[in-house]
Every structure is written in C-alpha cells, then in structure tokens.
C-alpha cells in the first residue's frame, strides 16, 4: 500500500514537471506593440515626413517628432491627433472649402509644413511648403496639379520654377510674389517670379494661390 502511494506521488510530480516544461514564453506582445507603432506611419504621414526631411526609423514614435494643428477661417487653432492631421492634409487639395487649413509643426525646431490650394488652367493645383515659422522663410516647396497641360502648365512641377520661391521671405500683410510674364508685370508683389512660357493662366493662378494662401495663415504666424 505504501509503495502504491509513493509511486502515485512520484507520478504526479513527474507529470507536473513535464507540463511546466511545455509552457512556452509569450513572445507575441512585443510584436503587437511594434506593429501598432508601425501603423502610425501611413502613406500620407510618410510623404509629409519625407518632404520635411525627417528620416524614418522602425522604433520612431511620430507623435514625438511632429504635431498637427488646424486653423479655421476665424484664425482659431486646434490641435489634432496624428490620424486626423494626416487626413486633413490628404483631403485638403480636393476639398472645395478653405476653412480648415492644415499645419504640421516639427517638434524642437522652428520648421512648419503648410499647404495652399487653388485652381489652374485645367483643374485643381496645390502646394506643400516647408517654412521657418520665425523668419517666415520658404525652405522648400512642391507644386502639384490634377490636369495641367504637359509642356505648359504642368511645368509648375519643374525644379527650375519651384526654386524661384525657395529662400524667399513671405509677407503676412500683402502680396509676397509678383508675376512677370513676357516683360509685363501681371501681378504686383514684393518678389518677382518668372512665369512659365505659354502658361500665363497657370502661372497667374499659382502666384495668386501662394499670395492668398499664405495670407490665410497670417494669424498663425502672428501667434508663433
């Protein structure tokens, strides 16, 4: 009888030890966390970060690097989370309303990314601008369009046209840019811009878009 009890105890201990040896460590949680963080960098955020010359890393928390805001038509500024901020930038060019202007601030710097939009000869045109919010200098610009004519209005995407705006300091009380086309000043302003040959309408609309769009951010610059 005693032997049976002893054998039973040994068997129970053996089975218990074997069960514990089969327990696998939970390796899934860190993977889930990393995946969740990676999802924050969607395609729109990637585009904005690259335009702002921000290098992406696998462990980067975007919220530590940039912050999004929105300015309404009255100049009221509201903070947005990453998803809402990226969505506003993505939808802004195709939206007919200019009431809510997107802002992306680069943390621990004076840099800010803004967007302006207008109408070209063939359809919507828009631009992203990387600026120094303190000096009001344009650091980088990228024009885009939906249906401008190749060889003419589509030339707004050429570096030779875009580079005219880089390094210019904007005015927040009147027109920054003037348009000069075929020796004639079509739009009055502080900084002359050479229009694209054969694309006077598109050139005019780009300059109007920048002048009016940047003036629309005047209250943002005033509170910086």
Residue ranges and their predicted role:
Residues 2-8:
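Sec-dependent signal peptide recognition
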Residues 8-9, 138:
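A ubiquitous, low-specificity "background" feature that marks scattered single residues
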Residues 13-16:
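C-terminal motif of bacterial Sec signal peptides marking the signal peptidase cleavage site
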Residues 18-224:
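Flexible, solvent-exposed loop/hinge segments and secondary-structure transition points
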